[in-house]
């Protein structure tokens, strides 16, 4: 599993399992809103009133509507001492994610 997948999959899966409403910003500036129904290596199924298949290559940013918590263990990552480090991201007033705990990478 590549390093980019080791963060992406657990993050999307947590959003899916917890049914967190998200805003997905596309590279062309369009904002989509809904809940992540499913995803694979290439697409995200987003559900609002209807289901939409969104190609990942068109996605710029995914912003959750509330805090989510991912531990490094869930992401398959550990620090140098082998200890678990957690990261929590909170959307700010502008809807951008801000780290509110330990950064994932130094």
Curated annotation (Swiss-Prot):
TM region(s), chain numbering: none
GO CC annotations on file: cytosol
Gene3D superfamilies linked: 2.30.30.100
Region called Disordered, residue ranges: 78-106
Keywords: RNA-binding, Stress response
Lineage top rank: taxon: Bacteria
An MF annotation (GO) of this entry: RNA binding
InterPro entries: Hfq, LSM_dom_sf, Sm
Subunit relationships: Homohexamer.
Summary of the function given for this chain in its UniProt record: RNA chaperone that binds small regulatory RNA (sRNAs) and mRNAs to facilitate mRNA translational regulation in response to envelope stress, environmental stress and changes in metabolite concentrations. Also binds with high specificity to tRNAs.
Record protein name field: RNA-binding protein Hfq
Species, as recorded: Dichelobacter nodosus (strain VCS1703A)
